[in-house]
């Protein structure tokens, strides 16, 4: 059992180291994550990014360099690398954090960058977004700027399956700035409540009313049929029986 635990711990550590290496090297390419799959004949490495061409390189030169690094420095056997584009980069916290880092390196104003990115994430369909930029923003004293739009979950069960979080650091002349991005992806939380529109309520009432009228009509028809059967099967009175005997 101990050997099995060590195996999985070592495997997770290698994947974490590779993930950190790729995030540091390819943040300008909008690096979003990596998936490592072991096969009997080698290892398949799937890299997700906003701009795959920057990772592939000219004529696949960067891919060949990565394969050699994965094999010699991280111990992956026969790595086969595939680079895929992120389906919706505006809803990926890592991609958004890398965009903010690149814009800050170019000298953009941090508050404007945070507001523009928050608006862009909400336009992509997110329920909420929170962006925190901390460090020496304007003065020698460190402070932070927080931009929060929509509904953001920080605790609870919703965080596990709805919130995507990423942290990135960028080095500027004043010092190191920290970037934290939290995106609440479009999904229905457990406490979701939707108030129906008046038209929907009216339509629902009409539907219930028609169903009640049909049920009442069916009950009335069944009662009439049952009453007719009772009248047809009524027993003869004593006078009727005496008349039948005399006849």
UniProtKB/Swiss-Prot annotation:
Keywords: Ribonucleoprotein, Ribosomal protein, RNA-binding, rRNA-binding
Single GO MF descriptor: rRNA binding
One GO BP: translation
Domain KH type-2: 18-87
SMART domains: KH
Cellular component annotations (GO), alphabetically ordered: cytosolic small ribosomal subunit
Physiological role: Binds the lower part of the 30S subunit head.
NCBIfam families given in the database record: PRK04191.1, uS3_euk_arch
Family under the similarity heading: Belongs to the universal ribosomal protein uS3 family.
Protein name: Small ribosomal subunit protein uS3
Encoding gene, per UniProt annotation: rps3
């Amino acid at each position: 059992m101990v050997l099995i635990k060590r195996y999985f711990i070592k495997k997770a550590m290698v994947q974490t180291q590779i993930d950190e290496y790729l995030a540091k090297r390819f943040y300008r390419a909008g690096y979003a994550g990596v998936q490592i799959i072991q096969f009997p004949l080698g290892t398949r490495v799937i890299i997700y990014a906003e701009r795959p061409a920057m990772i592939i390189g000219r004529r696949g030169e960067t891919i060949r360099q990565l394969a050699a690094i994965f094999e010699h420095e991280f111990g992956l056997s026969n790595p086969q690398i595939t680079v895929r584009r992120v389906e919706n980069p505006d809803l990926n916290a890592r991609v958004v954090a890398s965009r903010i880092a690149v814009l800050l390196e170019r000298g953009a104003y941090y508050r404007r960058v945070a507001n523009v990115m928050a608006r862009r994430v909400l336009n992509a369909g997110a329920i909420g977004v929170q962006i925190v930029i901390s460090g020496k923003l304007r003065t020698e004293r460190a402070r932070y700027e927080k931009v929060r739009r929509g509904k953001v979950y920080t605790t609870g069960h919703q965080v596990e399956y709805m919130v995507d979080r990423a942290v990135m650091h960028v080095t500027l002349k004043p010092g190191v700035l920290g970037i934290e991005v939290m995106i609440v992806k479009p999904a229905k939380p457990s406490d979701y409540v939707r108030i129906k529109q008046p038209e929907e309520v009216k339509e629902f009432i009409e539907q219930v009313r028609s169903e009640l009228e049909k049920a009442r009509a069916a009950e009335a028809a069944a009662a009439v049929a049952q009453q007719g059967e009772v009248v047809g099967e009524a027993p003869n009175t004593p006078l009727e029986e005496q008349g039948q005997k005399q006849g």
